[in-house]
Amino acid sequence: MNDEKDLRVRTKMFARRIIRLYCALPKNDAAAQVLGKQALRAGTSVGANYREAHRARSRAEFISKIGDCLKEADETLYWLELLLEENFLPAQKLEPLMKENDELIAVLTTISKRAKANA
């Protein structure tokens, strides 16, 4: 599988894990639901923006969309950290997602740097 397709699959799997995490949050806790919806929105946007990047009409648009991916991934990490720190879910559920998020940020950062260097 090529790297582009692999990252498409990886970001989609990440989004699916975020969806399952949201579904596991307590339904009767308003704070958990607010934080969860924010994580859901940001976490599912990473893959959507990555797909948009590969439909970009220019190198500048590609770089911009990869930047959007990075922003959403960083925001996702923020919401996951709050969910962990407020004990809405156990660390063993959140830490693997946070690790995957960190890895996605690293890959996307590399893509962004290479694209800018080749611009």
Say what each PLM segment does.
Residues 1-119:
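Amphipathic alpha-helical assembly/interaction segments
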